[in-house]
Amino acid sequence: MATRKAVRTAFEKCLLAVEPRSIVRNAISLNPSLLKIADYNYSLSNSTKIVVIAFGKASILMAKGARDQLKSSLLQKTIVIAPEQQKGIENELENDTEILYGARDNLPDEKSVFATRKVISEIRDFDSESTIFLFLISGGGSALLTSPSAPLDLAEKLETIRIMQAHGATIQELNTIRQNLSDVKGGKLLREIKKGCSIALIISDVIGNPVELIASGPTVIPAHQQDKFIISNILESLKINKLELPVNVKNVLENHEKEQLPENTSRFQNFIISSNNFALRAAAEYLTSSGYNSTIVTSSLSGNAAEIGKKFAEIITEKSITSSHLLKNSNLTIENYPIALLFGGETTVHLSENPGKGGRNQEMVLSCLDALKTRVPAHNFTFLSAGTDGQDGPTDAAGAIISNEDLPLNSLLNSSEFLQNSDSYNFWRQFKGGANHILTGPSGTNVMDIQILLLDQL
């Protein structure tokens, strides 16, 4: 019963559950005198105007959802910053919507910088006491809304990100440093709103949903501003010598000073409207209805992707699965087979010296498969790891899937080499003609990654 079809369908249910257009549409209601957005009410007057600003992997679909619910007479402007790869999915957005693109391969570029300048200009132009700025924020927003602090240039900021990623930095660590190298992140975008108010509807792509770190928190005034000691601790924990960093980056971080941010925080509201938990619940409901004893183990899976892959192999090869590393602290009760174990979160990859092409999900599944070369499964199993954005690393694959039928030793002899070279994408492209790749195309959203492990008796 542990079939690939069930796992693939469960992953599709995840994507449907976090579809951005419907989520935003459900968060907004309007009557002649009152606008309700999430849990916040706005009394409307004849002078009330709304400016919609969307950025992130879900920006186009989120903007569609907002425009579905808002009267055109209220809308003063809609501006969207979307990933370059999403060109062509903007159908149904009205002609008065301005769409800008950038961040190819999820890295900031000059198009991102230009688009950010445009957003700042629009905020300044439309700011008034009767203006509501509706921000629609999703994963990938950090690369799309980018404005390096002087004297930094974009190349120096990119080099810093590259160094941190090569040292296995988490999204939390990356975004903390990004905030300190930016003129818009960490609540600094709100400095441009002098008179109006703002509300942000946010799709979380960060473990634990810390609103101040999602897309690097451009609309969130930090409760406690970071000091240079926090920054230094991050670099030390990643074993990054400051001398590795570009000189301007090193100087900006070392001379970090307290930012001047707006003091009247009641004008600025932030609400998380979707997260990894939404996706996991949808998968669990589907698998339960399909006859599986389904359990959401965690939505906070983190760590090195290759090491986590080995731990999934441990579950697959242990008869008593609750003693395995990933499950021993979960208070899990396994009563009846078949079993569906669901995980969510975001892992990291330590790149080899001359890395190939891949992503954390493809690497996790490859590591699991590689570990199973020398171990015998204790269950019939199917294991999937995939990113909800449809793009695992700089590749066109969301992830990969394996099951018992993939284990003949003669077809796996070179798996270790691909793993050591951080080249998981090319392994899965070649292995069985690419049949194990999960190829969804860009989903238009991002709520981190999903792992599904189905187990049945042999």
Curated annotation (Swiss-Prot):
GO terms for molecular function: glycerate kinase activity. InterPro entries: GK-like_C_sf, GK_N_sf, MOFRL, MOFRL_assoc_dom, MOFRL_protein. Pfam families: DUF4147, MOFRL. GO terms for cellular component: cytoplasm. It comes from the Eukaryota. Belongs to the glycerate kinase type-2 family. This is Uncharacterized protein C13B9.2.
